[in-house]
Amino acid sequence: MDNSGKEAEAMALLAEAERKVKNSQSFFSGLFGGSSKIEEACEIYARAANMFKMAKNWSAAGSAFCQAAHVHLQLQSKHDAATCFVDAGNAFKKADPQEAINCLMRAIEIYTDMGRFTIAAKHHISIAEIYETELVDIEKAIAHYEQSADYYKGEESNSSANKCLLKVAGYAAQLEQYQKAIDIYEQVGTNAMDSPLLKYSAKDYFFKAALCHFCIDMLNAKLAVQKYEELFPAFSDSRECKRIKKLLEAHEEQNVDSYTEAVKEYDSISRLDQWLTTMLLRIKKTIQGDEEDLR
């Protein structure tokens, strides 16, 4: 069956579902099994939505899932309603990102009302990702990652909470909200230090915190590095610590060439990602006579 045939079938199913909902509201249906008609309508709306998905009509699929969700709410089937709102959100992601967010928020309201905070956290991440990639609203992405982290923390899912917080820190630093980023990197780094599995990554978080300090002020960064060495002696011997000290030295001497050389050395061992490149360039711009290139 081609897409137009699938759409026609989906439209017929929608009409059937709507008839059942309408009939269930009549007086006699109320006496004789109105709720069973509504249950059937839910099922038919979902079938229509899946048929629209097969036809790649994502908006129509999303709308049909939403209708199913509203009917589930009439039946007090909260969990089924939330599932349908999530299905609607996933369909709308491909056609209308803002509507996808609206549907996911409806699902989150239901899940939090039911005390299902881990699932709510997961959907806040989905919303954050839509703001990151589709709507490019980083402030809103940050807000949803923070909310997700709060819910994960409340459920003692600290590893998942930290992943969200690290996203917040990365974006906060890009938006020049350095203190916010520092607080998170230090908090996650301190927690990682105490874990045999995670302590290797602590040096990376302290390195990033030091770079954020460096973007504020060189003396800030120097004091921060000393603090991290005392707090986590393994940091002193790390490549990250040696690198930040070389960068500090070059900056103190206002030597652009030494600074660039230190960055090149670091890049030759572990490639610079976009975030590190941005931070290192911002610091380099504070050296007199720089020509705004790291290589």
From Swiss-Prot:
Encoding gene per record: NAPA
Cited CDD domains: SNAP (cd15832)
Cellular component annotations (GO), alphabetically ordered: plasma membrane; synapse; synaptobrevin 2-SNAP-25-syntaxin-1a complex
Protein topology in the membrane: Peripheral membrane protein
GO biological process terms, semicolon-separated: intracellular protein transport; regulation of synaptic vesicle priming; SNARE complex disassembly; synaptic transmission, glutamatergic
Residues with PTM Phosphoserine: 26, 29, 195
Cross-referenced PANTHER family: ALPHA-SOLUBLE NSF ATTACHMENT PROTEIN, SOLUBLE NSF ATTACHMENT PROTEIN SNAP
GO molecular function, one term: soluble NSF attachment protein activity
Protein name according to UniProt: Alpha-soluble NSF attachment protein
Function, in words: Required for vesicular transport between the endoplasmic reticulum and the Golgi apparatus. Together with GNA12 promotes CDH5 localization to plasma membrane.
Residue positions, PTM N-acetylmethionine: 1
Coiled coil: none
Family: Belongs to the SNAP family.
Quaternary structure, from the entry: Interacts with PRKCABP, and disrupts the interaction between GRIA2 and PRKCABP, leading to the internalization of GRIA2. Found in a complex with VAMP8. Component of a SNARE-like complex that contains at least ZW10, USE1L, RINT1, STX18 and NAPA/SNAP-alpha. Interacts with VTI1A. Interacts with STX12. Interacts with GNA12 (via N-terminus); the interaction promotes CDH5 localization to plasma membrane.
InterPro entries with a match to the protein in the record: NSF_attach, TPR-like_helical_dom_sf
Keywords per UniProt: Acetylation, Cell membrane, ER-Golgi transport, Membrane, Phosphoprotein, Protein transport, Transport
